[in-house]
């Protein structure tokens, strides 16, 4: 409160509520501590705090709703004489006194009204609001905008406020109250009456004297200057109405089709005159836009002329904006023009156009030259060599440009040495950079002579082609026919030294290759129109030109380099897959049908494509459709490989006819691959690298290839009948193995076969579990093994002695070798690598485990007593077997001589007692037959 004391000379202002004066002798009361304070209501009564279910203090008069009697419904009485007034209830009518108090949910706080608000708000917005409220169907309806529309504050607005900016102030450095008047330049002449020196505003100068020098103020809020460039035909500072925003979004003047009156009766403001049923008083947004969100464009907003000034007047101070002028002031001029422009009756609902339509200027198409080609043709880049000099000349003539002088070449075409020569620098002598520098002087002179001869021949060909082209040329620019003629002449001169009999650049297109061969034949005969005769008459001009260039380049470029490439490179043993590309599978074989349908002009189902497309599983899930291929892992179109098609297919060099030796070797390789692919893979198969690293397998294969197929010459030590028997037995073994391969490859030999080959005597003694699984046929097995060992040892002794006695003779290997190798490879597919077969008794050894396996299956279900009895028999048999081995060793040592030491060492122990290291050592000592 402000109290004004008129009696005093000074103006005093007091804020707040004053304390009551204390009486004499009264002491001021001490403040009550927080823990001793109690909660009371307005009447001084204690307030009780309830439990968890009430949630706070009492809700009224002793847990009632505000009164002793509680809440009673209000009575409603209405009669014809006394009508009940409609009571408008607000939220405050349903609240208690506690809710309206200072700490309630709706406190009655002091709110600044509009009378004390800032007067420096957006004046344009205030003016538009007043005009809209005055012309609205419901007067004052725009006040609802202030109640519904939230505060539209941008992020920059909030940041400026936090930085100290206030609404109505400008942005920039602070200034003084009024800028000092600038003193006029003394050099400027002033015509007329001189102004008073002090200025006419003396009162403002007096006010400035009271202000201190260090006080500054915020700058004035002014509208910034818009530097938008002028892109229309209006006058300066004129802003016409946008037809897309004004007059309800209709371009041009508005007219009403259903009103009988003239256009002048239409309302200028456009609020009510267009549609009487529309209420256009309320616009804007209700909620949903916060202070930090950008406002969306209001698509339902309407522009009317009521928001713009229709009368020219002076500017308001500080406004800085100009009003919009009404466009209908020119209607009187347009009315006079209507009678002059159009004679007749205008239809109802239509008006005559005020401006004629601007006619578009149509420009004629450009004139095409005679040698114009719709597709740009990139000419090949050919290196400037002695062989291709005539080709460079032909290319330059067909392009219509003379060849560039070497002295006038671009700097990008010169290297460092050539630039140094042009500048006259002395070259730096360093290490030789070319192979030609290592040649002797005689070789250099010989190369120079050959080069001069080739250059002379190329010059003669060039002169001949130039003479032929000059004879039929005219002053006009060179046409494509002249260029093609020079091509023919150059080709006819260079065909003598080329050999293109094996060169087929268009092997993939037989018809094109046939035309190419016909073209070469015509060129050899010397016919001038050789190319025109062999071309297809059904081709277009562009295709004929392209094929003409392809034939010429194929004949020139690749015939000369064929000999060089063949001397440096060899033919590939495997087919390269680079000439194939992936295309949709359904597109592979339907090209001919489509082309035939297009030629017959049967468009429709025949020319349509139907593809098998596998969608992604997520796509089917998003569109809620079943997957047509649930088990497919492919996405998209199934693809297969087919040949590429390119204009430069002929650039690949074809293979020449291979010699019979290479064909035979390739056939052998193919047969070997086919045999490898035909057999099933096994887990005992080893890779090529492992086979190379395995020394045991290496020597085994060496012994197999040398000893196995070798047939010694007939000698008195070898019986012919014995050789025939071994040969027949080996053939039978091979035939049986081949038949067994065709019958079934999944069967695998039993473990007894591997035990008989690789197991040693110590293993037999220690394997007690294997003894329990034995059968009654072990005696027969032992006798068979002993017979097999003895026969094998004797055969080895005879073979080694024969190999030492007989001299090696140049003899072709028997055809038994590849069959035996294939047989051993088939055995290896079912287990580890077996030792080499040196004797014809291998069949007996292979048949024995098969019979034992069959009998073993029959004897499996015998009682334990029989197993014990067999175990005792086996122990006795082992003792006799061991004694028999020792006796055999002694007899073999006494009977063998010193010359056959290697064969004796081989026969000391059977195959079952040899370790891999011992077998390797003995195989190295075997006398191998040399070719």
Swiss-Prot record:
Residues 152-198 form the G-patch domain. The keyword Phosphoprotein applies. The modification N-acetylalanine is found at residue 2. GO terms for biological process: mRNA processing. Residues 72-81, 659-668 have a biased composition (Polar residues). One of its GO terms (molecular function) is RNA binding. InterPro entries: DUF1604 (IPR011666), G_patch_dom (IPR000467). Residues 1-41, 72-92, 169-213, 567-594, 659-931 are annotated as: Disordered. Residues 1-12, 202-211, 769-780 have a biased composition (Acidic residues). The modification Phosphoserine is found at residues 6, 8, 358, 479, 715. Belongs to the GPATCH1 family. This is G patch domain-containing protein 1. The lineage of its organism: Eukaryota, Metazoa, Chordata, Craniata, Vertebrata.
């Amino acid at each position: 409160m402000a109290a004004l004391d008129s009696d005093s000379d000074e103006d005093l202002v007091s804020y707040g509520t004053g304390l009551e004066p204390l009486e004499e002798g009264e002491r001021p009361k001490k403040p009550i501590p927080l823990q001793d304070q109690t909660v009371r209501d307005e009447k001084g009564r204690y307030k009780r705090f309830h439990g968890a279910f009430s949630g706070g203090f009492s809700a009224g008069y002793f847990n009632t709703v505000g009164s002793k009697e509680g809440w009673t419904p209000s009575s409603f009485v209405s009669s014809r004489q006394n009508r009940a007034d409609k009571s408008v209830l607000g939220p405050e009518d349903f609240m208690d006194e506690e809710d309206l108090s200072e700490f309630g949910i709706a406190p009655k706080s002091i709110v600044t009204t509009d009378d004390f608000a800032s007067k420096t708000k957006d004046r344009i917005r205030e003016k538009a609001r007043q005009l809209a409220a005055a012309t609205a169907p419901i007067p004052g309806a725009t006040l609802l905008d202030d109640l519904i529309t939230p505060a539209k504050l941008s992020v920059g607005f909030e940041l400026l406020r936090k930085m100290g900016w206030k609404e109505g102030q400008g942005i920039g450095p602070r200034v003084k109250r009024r800028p000092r008047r600038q003193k006029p330049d003394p050099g400027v002449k002033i015509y007329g009456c001189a102004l008073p020196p002090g200025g006419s505003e003396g009162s403002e100068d007096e006010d400035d004297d009271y202000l201190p020098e260090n006080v500054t103020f915020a700058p004035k809020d002014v509208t910034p200057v818009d530097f938008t460039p002028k892109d229309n035909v209006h006058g300066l500072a004129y802003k016409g109405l946008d037809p897309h925003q004004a007059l309800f979004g209709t371009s041009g003047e508005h007219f009403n089709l259903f009103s009988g009156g003239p256009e002048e009766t239409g309302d200028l403001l456009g609020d009510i005159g267009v549609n009487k049923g529309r209420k256009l008083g309320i616009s804007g947004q209700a909620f949903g836009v916060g202070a930090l969100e950008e406002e969306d464009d209001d698509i339902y907003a309407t522009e009317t002329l009521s928001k713009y000034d229709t009368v020219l007047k002076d500017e308001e101070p500080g406004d800085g904006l100009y009003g919009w002028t009404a466009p209908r002031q020119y209607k009187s001029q347009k009315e006079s023009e209507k009678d002059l422009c159009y004679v007749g009756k205008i239809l109802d609902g239509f008006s005559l156009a005020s401006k004629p339509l601007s006619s578009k200027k149509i420009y004629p198409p450009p004139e095409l030259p005679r040698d114009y080609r719709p597709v740009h043709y990139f000419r090949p880049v050919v290196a400037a060599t002695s062989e291709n000099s005539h080709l460079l000349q032909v290319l330059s003539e067909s392009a219509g440009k003379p060849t560039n002088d070497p002295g006038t070449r671009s700097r990008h075409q010169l290297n460092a040495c050539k630039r140094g020569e042009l500048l006259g620098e002395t070259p730096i002598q360093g290490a030789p950079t070319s192979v030609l520098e290592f040649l002797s002087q005689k070789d250099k002179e010989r190369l120079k002579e050959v080069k001069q001869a080739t250059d002379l021949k190329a010059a003669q060909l060039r002169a001949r082609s130039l003479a032929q082209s000059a004879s039929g040329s005219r002053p006009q620019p060179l046409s494509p026919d002249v260029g093609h003629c020079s091509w023919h002449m150059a080709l006819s001169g260079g065909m003598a030294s080329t050999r293109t009999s094996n060169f087929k650049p268009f092997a993939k297109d037989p018809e094109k290759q046939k035309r190419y061969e016909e073209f070469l034949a015509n060129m050899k005969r010397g016919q001038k129109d050789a190319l025109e005769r062999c071309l297809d008459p059904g081709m277009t001009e562009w295709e004929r030109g392209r094929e003409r260039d392809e034939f010429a380049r194929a004949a020139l470029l690749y015939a000369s380099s064929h000999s060089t490439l063949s001397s440096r490179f060899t033919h590939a043993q495997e087919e390269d897959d680079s000439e194939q590309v992936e295309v949709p599978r359904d597109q592979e074989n339907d090209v001919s049908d489509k082309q035939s349908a297009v030629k017959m002009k049967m468009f429709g189902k025949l020319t349509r494509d139907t593809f098998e497309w596998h969608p992604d599983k997520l796509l089917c899930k998003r569109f809620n459709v079943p997957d047509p291929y649930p088990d497919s892992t492919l996405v998209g179109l199934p693809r297969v490989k087919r040949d590429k098609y390119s204009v430069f297919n002929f650039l690949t060099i074809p293979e020449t006819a291979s010699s019979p030796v290479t064909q035979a070797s390739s056939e052998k390789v193919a047969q070997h691959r086919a045999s490898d692919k035909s057999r099933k893979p096994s887990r005992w198969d080893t890779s090529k690298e492992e086979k190379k690293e395995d020394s045991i397998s290496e020597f085994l294969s060496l012994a197999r290839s040398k000893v196995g197929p070798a047939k010694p010459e007939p000698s008195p030590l070898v019986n012919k009948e014995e050789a025939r028997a071994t040969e027949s037995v080996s053939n039978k073994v091979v035939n049986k193995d081949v038949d067994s391969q065709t019958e079934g490859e999944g069967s695998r030999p039993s473990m007894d076969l591997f035990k008989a080959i690789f197991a040693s005597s110590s293993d037999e003694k220690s394997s007690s579990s294997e003894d329990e699984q034995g059968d009654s046929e072990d005696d027969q097995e032992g006798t068979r093994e002993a017979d097999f060992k003895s026969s094998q040892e004797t055969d080895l002794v005879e073979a080694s002695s024969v190999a030492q006695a007989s001299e090696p003779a140049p003899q072709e290997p028997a055809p038994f070798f590849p069959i035996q190798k294939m047989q051993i490879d088939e055995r290896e597919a079912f287990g580890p690598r077996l030792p080499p077969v040196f004797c014809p008794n291998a069949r007996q050894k292979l048949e024995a485990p098969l019979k034992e396996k069959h009998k073993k299956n029959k004897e499996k279900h015998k009682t334990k007593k029989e197993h014990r009895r067999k175990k005792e028999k086996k122990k006795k048999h082992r003792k006799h077997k061991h004694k028999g081995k020792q006796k055999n060793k002694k007899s073999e040592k006494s009977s063998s001589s010193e010359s056959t030491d290697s064969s004796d060492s081989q026969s000391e122990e059977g195959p079952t007692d040899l370790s891999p290291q011992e077998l390797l050592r003995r195989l190295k000592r075997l006398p191998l037959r040399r070719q």
